[in-house]
From Swiss-Prot:
Keyword terms of this UniProt record: Lyase, Magnesium, Menaquinone biosynthesis, Metal-binding
Family (UniProt): Belongs to the mandelate racemase/muconate lactonizing enzyme family. MenC type 1 subfamily.
CDD domains hit by this protein: OSBS
Cofactor: a divalent metal cation
Protein name, as recorded: o-succinylbenzoate synthase
EC numbers: 4.2.1.113
Role: Converts 2-succinyl-6-hydroxy-2,4-cyclohexadiene-1-carboxylate (SHCHC) to 2-succinylbenzoate (OSB).
Substrates-to-products reaction catalysed: (1R,6R)-6-hydroxy-2-succinyl-cyclohexa-2,4-diene-1-carboxylate = 2-succinylbenzoate + H2O
Top class in the EC scheme: lyase
The protein's annotated pathway: Quinol/quinone metabolism; 1,4-dihydroxy-2-naphthoate biosynthesis; 1,4-dihydroxy-2-naphthoate from chorismate: step 4/7; Quinol/quinone metabolism; menaquinone biosynthesis
Presence of keyword Transport: no
Residue positions of the active site: K133, K235
Protein source organism: Salmonella paratyphi B (strain ATCC BAA-1250 / SPB7)
Length: 320
């Protein structure tokens, strides 16, 4: 016998979280819990403002429609990426397709003070990998910060993310301030320029490896082996169903590319599922999931080791 619940939630964010020039004061989303007999499966639907095509309200309408169809025996999935991902995760838990094993390691995210990152990395066992957002300040400053980190920690590898913020000139200004001897320790730089051609040229001219992120969600994107392209970053909330995520991972791995499963600032429930997906589909590659510290609470499923309070399901607003 099938049954389902849908919950709506809102989590206050720490001050200072800015996405594409807009301050994110709260993280808004939905959970779906599907039940079939004794089995249960959860999924998170949380479109990311400024990145997702759909709004929270549109996702809610699509989710409620899909859940009612599922209760009637329909096995299809919705089209909206965030809804398709959350619904497919709930189904994958329900049917046992999504393994329980998880990779709770996370590449620490440096959002401000480089000294803070140095302290966090000092306690990190094994390979030291961190992520730095670039493109928010002057390109010269970004280059100096990256150079400082690579100089201060000789075994550090950095993943950088520019979110297409730079013109070719700005990108070159950044590279100018990174010692050529350190550039090989930039694991990759996600989407440095506004166009793929400019990003490719940047990789050729600087020797800094790049990764595709936003490009994966563009209609004309195809997986190809390209000079200077080392990785792809997959954000499942923005991608779609779990099957689509698996297809993209397989296509990238077939070309020898590194695949990083990355957060779209999901709640703790969604992050724990991404940790399981990373362990399943990209074993051995550190996922990019260090975003929980941007929030003021966890929900339903806590992240191991987090001191944030965790709300239980009966504390959430139930829609169905």
């Amino acid at each position: 016998m099938r049954s389902a619940q849908v919950y709506r939630w809102q989590i206050p964010m720490d001050a200072g979280v800015v996405l594409r020039d807009r301050r994110l004061k709260t993280r808004d989303g939905l959970y779906v819990c599907l039940c079939d007999g004794e089995r249960e499966g959860w999924g998170e639907i949380s479109p990311l403002p400024g990145f997702s095509q759909e709004t929270w309200e549109e996702a809610q309408t699509a989710l409620l429609t899909w859940v009612n169809d599922w209760l009637q025996g329909n096995e299809g999935l919705p089209e909206m990426p965030s809804v398709a991902f959350g619904a497919s995760c709930a189904l994958a838990e329900l049917t046992g397709v999504l393994p329980e094993a998880a990779d709770y390691r996370a590449a620490p995210l440096c959002t401000g003070d480089p000294d803070d990152l140095v302290l966090r990395l000092a306690d990190m066992p094994g390979e030291k990998i961190a992520k730095v957002k670039v493109g928010l300040y002057e390109a010269v400053r970004d280059g100096m910060v990256v150079n400082l980190l690579l100089e201060a920690i000789p075994d550090l590898h950095l993943r950088l993310d520019a979110n297409r913020a730079w013109t070719p000139l700005k990108a070159q200004q950044f590279a100018k301030y990174v010692n050529p001897d350190y550039r090989a320790r930039i694991a990759f730089l996600e989407e440095p320029c506004k166009t793929r051609d400019d990003s490719r040229a940047f990789a050729r001219e600087t020797g800094i490896a790049i990764a595709w992120d936003e490009s994966l969600r563009e209609a004309d994107f195809t997986f190809e082996a390209e000079e200077g392209v080392k990785a792809v970053v997959i954000k499942p909330t923005l991608t779609g169903s779990l099957d689509k995520v698996r297809e993209q991972v397989a296509a990238a791995h077939a070309l020898g590319l590194t695949v990083v499963i990355s957060s779209s600032i999901e709640s703790s429930l969604g992050l724990t599922q991404l940790a399981r997906i990373a362990a399943w589909l990209t074993p051995g590659t550190l996922p990019g999931l260090d975003t929980l510290h941007l929030m003021q609470a966890q929900q339903v499923r806590p992240w191991p080791g987090s001191a944030l309070p965790c709300l239980k399901r009966d504390e959430l607003e139930r829609l169905l």
